[in-house]
UniProtKB/Swiss-Prot annotation:
Reactions the enzyme catalyzes: 1-(2-carboxyphenylamino)-1-deoxy-D-ribulose 5-phosphate + H(+) = (1S,2R)-1-C-(indol-3-yl)glycerol 3-phosphate + CO2 + H2O
Gene: trpC
EC number(s) from the headed UniProt entry: 4.1.1.48
UniProt similarity note: Belongs to the TrpC family.
Amino-acid biosynthesis is among the record's keywords: yes
Protein name, per record: Indole-3-glycerol phosphate synthase
Enzyme class: lyase
Family annotation (Pfam families): IGPS
PROSITE patterns (UniProt xref): IGPS (PS00614)
Amino acid sequence: MSVLDEIIDGVRADLAERQARVSLDELKERVAKAPAAKDGVAALRGDGVKVICEVKRSSPSKGALAAIADPAALAADYEAGGASVISVLTEQRRFGGSLADLEAVRAKVDIPVLRKDFIVTSYQLWEARAYGADLALLIVAALEQPALESLIERAVSIGLTPIVEVHDEDEAERAVDAGAKVIGVNARNLKTLKVDRTTFERVAPEIPEGIVKIAESGVRGPHDLIAYANAGADAVLVGESLVTGRDPKAAVADLVAAGTHPALRHGRG
Protein backbone atom coordinates (compact mmCIF):
# COMPACT_ATOMS: atom_id res chain seq x y z
CA MET A 1 0.00 0.00 0.00
CA SER A 2 1.35 3.43 -0.96
CA VAL A 3 1.72 6.34 1.44
CA LEU A 4 -1.15 8.05 -0.37
CA ASP A 5 -3.39 5.00 0.04
CA GLU A 6 -2.59 4.84 3.76
CA ILE A 7 -3.36 8.52 4.21
CA ILE A 8 -6.67 8.25 2.37
CA ASP A 9 -7.70 5.22 4.41
CA GLY A 10 -7.16 7.31 7.54
CA VAL A 11 -8.98 10.26 6.02
CA ARG A 12 -12.01 8.10 5.22
CA ALA A 13 -12.10 6.70 8.77
CA ASP A 14 -11.91 10.17 10.32
CA LEU A 15 -14.47 11.45 7.83
CA ALA A 16 -16.97 8.77 8.85
CA GLU A 17 -16.66 9.89 12.48
CA ARG A 18 -17.29 13.53 11.58
CA GLN A 19 -20.25 12.62 9.38
CA ALA A 20 -21.76 10.77 12.33
CA ARG A 21 -21.47 13.91 14.45
CA VAL A 22 -22.37 16.62 11.93
CA SER A 23 -24.91 16.06 9.17
CA LEU A 24 -24.52 17.42 5.66
CA ASP A 25 -27.65 19.50 6.22
CA GLU A 26 -26.02 21.13 9.26
CA LEU A 27 -22.97 22.03 7.18
CA LYS A 28 -25.17 23.46 4.44
CA GLU A 29 -27.04 25.60 6.98
CA ARG A 30 -23.74 26.94 8.27
CA VAL A 31 -22.55 27.75 4.75
CA ALA A 32 -25.82 29.53 3.98
CA LYS A 33 -25.16 31.89 6.89
CA ALA A 34 -21.48 32.42 6.08
CA PRO A 35 -20.01 35.38 4.18
CA ALA A 36 -19.38 34.81 0.48
CA ALA A 37 -16.09 33.11 -0.31
CA LYS A 38 -13.20 35.27 -1.48
CA ASP A 39 -12.05 34.97 -5.09
CA GLY A 40 -9.14 32.53 -5.04
CA VAL A 41 -8.32 32.88 -8.73
CA ALA A 42 -8.11 36.67 -8.49
CA ALA A 43 -5.75 36.36 -5.53
CA LEU A 44 -3.36 34.26 -7.60
CA ARG A 45 -3.37 36.41 -10.74
CA GLY A 46 -1.73 39.73 -11.47
CA ASP A 47 1.81 41.03 -11.57
CA GLY A 48 4.58 38.97 -10.09
CA VAL A 49 4.62 35.54 -8.52
CA LYS A 50 2.15 35.12 -5.68
CA VAL A 51 3.10 33.39 -2.43
CA ILE A 52 0.84 30.85 -0.72
CA CYS A 53 2.00 30.26 2.85
CA GLU A 54 1.17 27.11 4.76
CA VAL A 55 0.26 26.29 8.35
CA LYS A 56 1.88 22.87 8.67
CA ARG A 57 2.85 21.07 11.87
CA SER A 58 4.19 17.81 10.45
CA SER A 59 4.49 15.77 7.27
CA PRO A 60 4.90 12.11 6.25
CA SER A 61 8.36 12.83 4.87
CA LYS A 62 9.82 14.77 7.82
CA GLY A 63 7.61 13.97 10.80
CA ALA A 64 7.13 16.78 13.32
CA LEU A 65 8.13 20.19 11.95
CA ALA A 66 6.75 22.78 14.37
CA ALA A 67 4.34 22.83 17.30
CA ILE A 68 2.36 25.89 16.06
CA ALA A 69 0.35 26.47 19.22
CA ASP A 70 -1.39 29.45 17.61
CA PRO A 71 -2.04 28.89 13.90
CA ALA A 72 -3.97 32.15 13.64
CA ALA A 73 -0.97 34.15 14.85
CA LEU A 74 1.28 32.41 12.34
CA ALA A 75 -1.21 33.15 9.57
CA ALA A 76 -1.29 36.80 10.63
CA ASP A 77 2.50 36.92 10.30
CA TYR A 78 2.21 35.42 6.83
CA GLU A 79 -0.37 38.02 5.84
CA ALA A 80 1.76 40.84 7.24
CA GLY A 81 4.68 39.54 5.20
CA GLY A 82 2.64 39.85 2.01
CA ALA A 83 1.20 36.38 1.43
CA SER A 84 -1.61 36.20 -1.13
CA VAL A 85 -3.26 33.04 0.26
CA ILE A 86 -2.95 31.04 3.49
CA SER A 87 -2.95 27.23 3.17
CA VAL A 88 -4.13 25.30 6.22
CA LEU A 89 -3.50 21.57 6.56
CA THR A 90 -6.59 19.97 8.09
CA GLU A 91 -5.51 16.31 7.90
CA GLN A 92 -4.78 15.17 11.45
CA ARG A 93 -2.96 11.82 11.37
CA ARG A 94 0.04 12.69 9.21
CA PHE A 95 0.00 16.49 9.19
CA GLY A 96 -1.30 17.40 12.66
CA GLY A 97 -3.97 19.72 11.31
CA SER A 98 -7.65 20.24 12.04
CA LEU A 99 -10.77 22.08 10.96
CA ALA A 100 -10.35 24.14 14.13
CA ASP A 101 -7.07 25.44 12.69
CA LEU A 102 -8.90 26.42 9.50
CA GLU A 103 -11.62 28.20 11.44
CA ALA A 104 -9.10 30.07 13.60
CA VAL A 105 -7.08 31.22 10.61
CA ARG A 106 -10.19 32.36 8.73
CA ALA A 107 -11.22 34.49 11.71
CA LYS A 108 -7.80 36.15 11.85
CA VAL A 109 -6.85 37.05 8.27
CA ASP A 110 -8.50 38.94 5.45
CA ILE A 111 -6.84 37.16 2.52
CA PRO A 112 -8.20 33.93 0.99
CA VAL A 113 -7.69 30.65 2.85
CA LEU A 114 -7.08 27.22 1.32
CA ARG A 115 -8.19 23.96 2.91
CA LYS A 116 -5.37 21.54 2.16
CA ASP A 117 -6.45 17.97 2.76
CA PHE A 118 -7.15 14.73 0.95
CA ILE A 119 -10.64 15.48 -0.29
CA VAL A 120 -12.55 12.48 -1.62
CA THR A 121 -16.19 13.45 -1.05
CA SER A 122 -18.38 16.52 -1.49
CA TYR A 123 -19.03 16.47 2.28
CA GLN A 124 -15.44 17.67 2.76
CA LEU A 125 -16.06 20.56 0.37
CA TRP A 126 -19.06 21.65 2.40
CA GLU A 127 -16.88 21.34 5.52
CA ALA A 128 -14.27 23.55 3.88
CA ARG A 129 -16.81 26.31 3.24
CA ALA A 130 -18.46 25.88 6.63
CA TYR A 131 -15.14 26.41 8.41
CA GLY A 132 -14.16 29.39 6.29
CA ALA A 133 -12.14 28.15 3.33
CA ASP A 134 -12.19 30.00 0.03
CA LEU A 135 -10.16 27.40 -1.86
CA ALA A 136 -9.89 23.61 -1.59
CA LEU A 137 -7.22 21.18 -2.77
CA LEU A 138 -8.17 18.27 -5.02
CA ILE A 139 -5.43 15.70 -5.69
CA VAL A 140 -5.65 13.99 -9.07
CA ALA A 141 -3.74 10.93 -7.84
CA ALA A 142 -6.37 10.37 -5.15
CA LEU A 143 -9.40 10.50 -7.45
CA GLU A 144 -10.85 8.68 -10.41
CA GLN A 145 -11.69 11.00 -13.30
CA PRO A 146 -15.49 11.09 -12.77
CA ALA A 147 -14.98 11.91 -9.09
CA LEU A 148 -12.44 14.62 -9.94
CA GLU A 149 -14.81 16.24 -12.41
CA SER A 150 -17.73 16.01 -9.98
CA LEU A 151 -15.76 17.52 -7.09
CA ILE A 152 -14.47 20.39 -9.22
CA GLU A 153 -18.04 21.15 -10.28
CA ARG A 154 -19.35 20.92 -6.73
CA ALA A 155 -16.56 23.10 -5.34
CA VAL A 156 -17.28 25.86 -7.84
CA SER A 157 -21.02 25.61 -7.24
CA ILE A 158 -20.62 26.38 -3.53
CA GLY A 159 -18.12 29.19 -4.01
CA LEU A 160 -14.83 27.37 -3.56
CA THR A 161 -11.88 27.75 -5.91
CA PRO A 162 -10.46 24.25 -6.49
CA ILE A 163 -6.70 23.91 -6.74
CA VAL A 164 -6.12 20.69 -8.65
CA GLU A 165 -2.82 19.06 -7.70
CA VAL A 166 -0.78 17.03 -10.18
CA HIS A 167 2.58 15.26 -10.13
CA ASP A 168 3.26 14.46 -13.78
CA GLU A 169 2.21 15.17 -17.35
CA ASP A 170 -0.57 12.56 -17.41
CA GLU A 171 -2.16 13.99 -14.28
CA ALA A 172 -1.88 17.49 -15.74
CA GLU A 173 -3.81 16.33 -18.79
CA ARG A 174 -6.49 14.84 -16.53
CA ALA A 175 -6.74 18.10 -14.58
CA VAL A 176 -7.14 20.14 -17.75
CA ASP A 177 -9.73 17.71 -19.12
CA ALA A 178 -11.66 17.97 -15.85
CA GLY A 179 -11.93 21.72 -16.20
CA ALA A 180 -9.34 22.92 -13.68
CA LYS A 181 -8.69 26.67 -13.69
CA VAL A 182 -5.90 26.47 -11.10
CA ILE A 183 -3.35 23.65 -11.19
CA GLY A 184 -0.69 22.98 -8.58
CA VAL A 185 2.34 20.96 -9.66
CA ASN A 186 3.75 19.14 -6.65
CA ALA A 187 7.46 18.37 -6.89
CA ARG A 188 7.20 15.74 -4.15
CA ASN A 189 6.91 12.18 -5.43
CA LEU A 190 4.01 10.49 -3.63
CA LYS A 191 5.73 7.11 -3.69
CA THR A 192 9.23 8.07 -2.56
CA LEU A 193 8.35 11.38 -0.84
CA LYS A 194 11.47 12.85 -2.46
CA VAL A 195 11.39 16.34 -3.97
CA ASP A 196 12.42 16.82 -7.60
CA ARG A 197 12.42 20.53 -8.44
CA THR A 198 12.57 19.78 -12.16
CA THR A 199 9.03 18.38 -12.03
CA PHE A 200 7.45 21.79 -12.52
CA GLU A 201 9.49 22.68 -15.60
CA ARG A 202 8.56 19.32 -17.15
CA VAL A 203 4.85 19.52 -16.40
CA ALA A 204 4.11 23.23 -16.80
CA PRO A 205 4.31 23.19 -20.63
CA GLU A 206 1.41 20.71 -20.64
CA ILE A 207 -0.83 23.25 -18.89
CA PRO A 208 -2.53 25.70 -21.28
CA GLU A 209 -2.18 29.46 -21.01
CA GLY A 210 -4.94 30.99 -18.93
CA ILE A 211 -4.77 28.33 -16.22
CA VAL A 212 -3.06 29.50 -13.02
CA LYS A 213 0.07 27.43 -12.38
CA ILE A 214 1.30 26.87 -8.83
CA ALA A 215 4.66 25.32 -7.96
CA GLU A 216 4.34 23.22 -4.80
CA SER A 217 7.17 21.81 -2.65
CA GLY A 218 10.87 22.58 -2.72
CA VAL A 219 10.77 26.32 -2.06
CA ARG A 220 13.56 27.00 0.43
CA GLY A 221 13.98 30.68 -0.34
CA PRO A 222 13.86 33.39 -3.02
CA HIS A 223 16.23 31.51 -5.35
CA ASP A 224 13.77 28.63 -5.65
CA LEU A 225 10.88 31.02 -6.25
CA ILE A 226 12.83 32.69 -9.05
CA ALA A 227 13.64 29.33 -10.63
CA TYR A 228 9.98 28.34 -10.56
CA ALA A 229 8.98 31.75 -11.92
CA ASN A 230 11.36 31.37 -14.82
CA ALA A 231 9.73 28.00 -15.56
CA GLY A 232 6.30 29.64 -15.74
CA ALA A 233 4.89 29.58 -12.20
CA ASP A 234 2.23 32.14 -11.34
CA ALA A 235 2.48 31.27 -7.64
CA VAL A 236 4.46 29.12 -5.22
CA LEU A 237 3.25 27.23 -2.16
CA VAL A 238 5.66 27.31 0.78
CA GLY A 239 5.32 25.48 4.08
CA GLU A 240 8.22 23.63 5.66
CA SER A 241 10.85 26.35 5.26
CA LEU A 242 8.53 28.89 6.88
CA VAL A 243 7.36 26.89 9.89
CA THR A 244 10.90 25.73 10.68
CA GLY A 245 12.47 29.17 10.25
CA ARG A 246 13.10 31.79 12.91
CA ASP A 247 11.13 34.67 11.40
CA PRO A 248 8.21 33.60 9.18
CA LYS A 249 7.07 37.16 8.51
CA ALA A 250 10.50 38.23 7.25
CA ALA A 251 10.88 35.04 5.22
CA VAL A 252 7.56 35.67 3.50
CA ALA A 253 8.51 39.27 2.82
CA ASP A 254 11.74 38.09 1.16
CA LEU A 255 9.78 35.70 -1.05
CA VAL A 256 7.22 38.35 -1.97
CA ALA A 257 9.99 40.81 -2.83
CA ALA A 258 11.59 38.24 -5.12
CA GLY A 259 8.23 37.48 -6.70
CA THR A 260 7.55 41.12 -7.45
CA HIS A 261 11.00 41.94 -8.83
CA PRO A 262 10.60 43.89 -12.10
CA ALA A 263 12.66 41.32 -13.98
CA LEU A 264 9.94 38.72 -13.35
CA ARG A 265 6.96 40.86 -14.32
CA HIS A 266 7.30 40.55 -18.06
CA GLY A 267 4.83 38.03 -19.41
CA ARG A 268 3.13 37.40 -16.08
CA GLY A 269 -0.44 38.08 -15.02
